[in-house]
């Protein structure tokens, strides 16, 4: 190769029009004619976005660009035509541009690459050199003789043979054997040598160790060692000289018995398997071929399968979760996760107690178990469990058949709950407690009583609010009275309790008697220490009625009975009506005297038992001090105490006399218990008897009550005095007496009920006749005002009330007016107020004290013998 080498080859050359004509021109013309023939195969549609695909001017149809030919849906083949046609060893890489084929180089691509080069323009170096040659296109090595390996780097070790070019294994020449073909074979011409073992293998028709014996098997081979004939197909016998009669099978080589092929049976294997069977000896059953079609007798294949079956032999059910023809349907979900039937799609099985295509239906009543195949036993008052068949009892019964009632103390389902009743007598079904007849009545009565109490409380609250708003006596008060009223809050609170009692309905107590009343002054600053009248004993003489406004529910009691409060008017500075002047009373006498005399022991001033609610309420609400009364239950005293009181002898009553019935016309409308007293009347208290009186009980035999304790406290304290004021002109004597201020409190501790002891040590003592006359004047004034009130009420309409029985009246002789202590004028603003003419003030309804009652006849007789009631 002169001046030509692989490195000096030009890249590519362009054929010009003036080049020499190609020697391959006739062949190219033939190819062009073939290309111009109509194509019998429809060309593939071009991809508008493919390589070298263009659009013709004025058309939207894609076509290959100039110089390119279609290859698939693109234009990937370059075309070199005309003067640009490539030679035999050239390839067209671009339109009108040729390049040398791999393995060739030169100006005309007519020079083959040297052994050590390959590829385009012989630019790639061959790695097999010098023991092999590279392929021009791929560069794969082809080793020379006696060389092997990927790069022909290994030498072949076979002595009488060749090596495999990749593995190097030896291929021995005939007559040689061994790993490297180094051993020679010693076999006759009727045999060949085994290259691995070197043993001689006899040719067909020869047998023996040296393969020198010929077989006598009628052209059939024989065993190499024994020479026994190995008959060919369809022959049998010792020499393979008999013809086999089997139609679809093989004959036994000795006796010629037929061994039928699968799908046939019979002596000569002429009978195919019956429908539904296939295989060797027709022993296997066909699968679920559709429509009872027979399967192939040899393999058992079916043309189509029944619904729910799959496989070539239709012997495999549908996979889990599928069913139907061709196993193309998906099973709907079954209850409890069970699979569906591969043929019908229904659930294969259900849990005990459920049936249906989807196991969605419970067993009907009376059956239970799997597929509801079992019948329930009799469950009495219960029902059968649809799963287990066990009787489920209703509340109140138990047992295997639900026919046993719950024992006492238990209830509910299966009697599993304990009763919460006191005596375990509850309903076995609901557990409600059974009440006996008396218990039911008690519960009903308690409910009714509760309703009545609620109604009563609501009524009391309503009445209190209504009466407080309608009280005509409430009016604006001066600032000083308001300040004094704050100090007397306990007394007003006591009065409000009495107002509640006045709103209660009147309850007739026809078989009770009025109690005895003992009046004693209490300190104005005393704490809340009042109660109401004690209900008379039911064993005494019946009375027409007793005002329910005298409550028996609260306040203090003493050894002699309960204590109730009677408010009196305020002092001049504390008076509710500032327009009415008041006259202070003189200081009490130095020596106490009894309130009654033997001459007045036969009569007693009657005291009414009822009172007007509004007047009594207004009087109790006053800020002034209160008169307290004790209801003394008289006990049997010695004859000496019974016969004389305060040193005065009284003749005992010969017999107990029943008092005559009261006159309804003279019954007052206002009770002295709640009536408003004037300051003067309340202030003139009788003097107590001397300490040595036999009628006074011993101090050691008498308990100290809260009222006595308060009285004792005031007694040892500093004495309080009031400035006496003169009676204003024009004011009647009775009004003056009623308006007089209240004297200091008197205590009766240790001197018997009704005996008053002055606590004011500063003033002169008052005589007994003087005190008696003042008390009589007060009572006469109250009686007159009561009469005027009755006349006024009679004009409006009489109120019929049952009159209480009257006791024998004991009168107190009036004291001489000359003995009344003179009133001294008090200078100050009060005097200027009294100089003015006093306006006419409304008369207060002053009740009269009701005579007390005794519990027994002996007590009544003792009262008659004792004389007048102790005030």
From Swiss-Prot:
Record field: compositional bias (Low complexity): 821-831, 861-871
Residues modified by glycosylation: 83, 310, 365, 403
- Which topology term describes how it sits in the membrane? Single-pass type I membrane protein
> Which PROSITE patterns does this chain map to?
EGF_1 (PS00022), EGF_2 (PS01186), EGF_3 (PS50026)
Domain EGF-like spans what residues?
71-110, 122-153, 148-182, 183-212, 213-241, 236-270, 372-403
Q: Impact of changing residue 499 to C on the protein? A: In a breast cancer sample; somatic mutation
Q: What is its main location?
A: membrane
Gene Ontology annotations for the cellular component aspect, listed alphabetically? focal adhesion; membrane
**Is Transmembrane helix one of the keywords UniProt gives this record?**
yes
Q: Which residues carry this modification: Phosphotyrosine?
A: 628
Where does the record place the modification Phosphoserine?
Answer: 551, 613, 651, 653, 710, 718, 742
From which residue to which does the signal peptide run?
1-43
Q: Give the Basic and acidic residues compositional bias ranges.
A: 570-579, 632-643, 705-725
> Which GO terms of the molecular function aspect are on file?
scavenger receptor activity
Q: What does this protein's UniProt record list under function?
A: Probable adhesion protein, which mediates homophilic and heterophilic interactions. In contrast to SCARF1, it poorly mediates the binding and degradation of acetylated low density lipoprotein (Ac-LDL).
Full protein name: Scavenger receptor class F member 2
Native species: Homo sapiens
Which gene is the coding source of this polypeptide chain? Answer: SCARF2
């Amino acid at each position: 190769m002169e001046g030509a080498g692989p490195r000096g080859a030009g890249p590519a050359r362009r054929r010009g029009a003036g080049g020499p004509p190609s020697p391959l021109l006739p062949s190219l013309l033939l190819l062009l004619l073939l290309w111009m023939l109509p194509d019998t195969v429809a060309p593939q549609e071009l991809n508008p976005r493919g390589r070298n695909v263009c659009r013709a001017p004025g058309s939207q149809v894609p076509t290959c660009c100039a110089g390119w030919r279609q290859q698939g849906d693109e234009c990937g083949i370059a075309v070199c035509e005309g003067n640009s046609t490539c030679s035999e060893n050239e390839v067209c890489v671009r339109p009108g541009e040729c390049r040398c084929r791999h393995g060739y180089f030169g100006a005309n691509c007519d020079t083959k690459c040297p052994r050590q080069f390959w590829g385009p323009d012989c630019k790639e170096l061959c790695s097999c050199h010098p023991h092999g040659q590279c392929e021009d296109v791929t560069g794969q090595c082809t080793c020379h003789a006696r060389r092997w390996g990927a790069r022909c780097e290994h030498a072949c070790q076979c002595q009488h043979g060749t090596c495999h070019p990749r593995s190097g294994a030896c291929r021995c020449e005939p007559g040689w054997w061994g790993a490297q073909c180094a051993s020679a074979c010693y076999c006759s011409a009727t045999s060949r040598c085994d290259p691995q073992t070197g043993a001689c293998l006899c040719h067909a028709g020869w047998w023996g160790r040296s393969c020198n014996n010929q077989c006598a098997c009628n052209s059939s081979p024989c065993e190499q060692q024994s020479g026994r004939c190995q008959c060919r197909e369809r022959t049998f016998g010792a020499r393979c000289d008999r013809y086999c009669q089997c139609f679809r099978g093989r004959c036994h080589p000795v006796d010629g018995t037929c061994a039928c092929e699968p799908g046939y049976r019979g002596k000569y294997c002429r009978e195919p398997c019956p429908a539904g069977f296939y295989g060797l000896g027709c022993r296997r059953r066909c699968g679920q071929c559709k429509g009872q079609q027979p399967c192939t007798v040899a393999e058992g294949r079916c043309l189509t399968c029944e619904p729910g079956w799959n496989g070539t032999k239709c012997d495999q059910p549908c996979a889990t979760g599928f069913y139907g023809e061709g196993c193309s349907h998906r099973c709907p979900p079954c209850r409890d996760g069970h699979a569906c039937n591969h043929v019908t799609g229904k659930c294969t099985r259900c849990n005990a107690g459920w049936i249906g295509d989807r196991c969605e239906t419970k067993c009907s009543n009376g059956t239970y178990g799997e597929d509801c195949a079992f019948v329930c036993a009799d469950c009495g008052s219960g029902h059968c469990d649809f799963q287990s068949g066990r009787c489920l009892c209703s509340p109140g019964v138990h047992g295997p058949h639900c026919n046993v009632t719950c024992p006492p103390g238990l209830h509910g389902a299966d009697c599993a709950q304990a009763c919460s009743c006191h005596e375990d007598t509850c309903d076995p079904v609901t557990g409600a407690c059974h009440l006996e007849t008396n218990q039911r009545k008690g519960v009903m009565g308690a409910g009714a009583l509760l309703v009545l109490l609620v109604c009563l409380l609501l009524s009391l609250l309503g009445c209190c609010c209504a009466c407080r708003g309608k009280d005509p006596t409430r009016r604006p008060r001066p600032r000083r009275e308001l300040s004094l009223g704050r100090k007397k809050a306990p007394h007003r609170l006591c009065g409000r309790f009495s107002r509640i009692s006045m709103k209660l309905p009147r309850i007739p107590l026809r078989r009770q008697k009025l109690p005895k009343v003992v009046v004693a002054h209490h300190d104005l600053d005393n704490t809340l220490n009042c109660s109401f009248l004690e209900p008379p004993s039911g064993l005494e003489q019946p009375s027409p009625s007793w005002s329910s406004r005298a409550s028996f529910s609260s306040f203090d009691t003493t050894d002699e009975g309960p204590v109730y409060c009677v408010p009196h008017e305020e002092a001049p500075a504390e008076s509710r009506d500032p327009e009415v002047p008041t006259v202070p009373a003189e200081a009490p006498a130095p020596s106490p005297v009894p309130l009654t005399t033997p001459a007045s022991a036969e009569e007693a001033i009657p005291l009414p038992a009822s009172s007007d609610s509004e007047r009594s309420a207004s009087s109790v609400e006053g800020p002034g001090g209160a008169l307290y009364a004790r209801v003394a239950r008289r006990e049997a005293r010695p004859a000496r105490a019974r016969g004389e009181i305060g040193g005065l002898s009284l003749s005992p009553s010969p017999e107990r006399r029943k008092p005559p019935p009261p006159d309804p016309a003279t019954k007052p409308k206002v009770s002295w218990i709640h009536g408003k007293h004037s300051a003067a009347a309340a202030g003139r208290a009788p003097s107590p008897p001397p300490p040595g009186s036999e009628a006074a009980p011993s101090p050691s035999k008498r308990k100290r009550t809260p009222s006595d304790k308060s009285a004792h406290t005031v007694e040892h304290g500093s004495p309080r005095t009031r400035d006496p004021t003169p009676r204003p002109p024009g004011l009647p004597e009775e009004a003056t007496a009623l308006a007089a201020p209240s004297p200091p409190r008197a205590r009766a501790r240790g001197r018997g009920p009704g005996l008053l002891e002055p606590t004011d040590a500063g003033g002169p003592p008052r005589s007994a006749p003087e005190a008696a006359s003042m008390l009589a004047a007060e009572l006469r004034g109250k009686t007159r005002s009561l009469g005027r009130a009755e006349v006024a009420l009679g004009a409006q309409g009489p109120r019929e009330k049952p009159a209480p029985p009257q006791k024998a009246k004991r009168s107190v002789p009036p004291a001489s007016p000359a003995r009344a202590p003179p009133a001294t004028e008090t200078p100050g603003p009060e005097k200027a107020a009294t100089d003015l003419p006093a306006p006419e003030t409304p008369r207060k309804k002053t009740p009269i004290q009701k005579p007390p009652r005794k519990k027994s006849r002996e007590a009544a007789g003792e009262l008659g013998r004792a004389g007048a009631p102790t005030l």
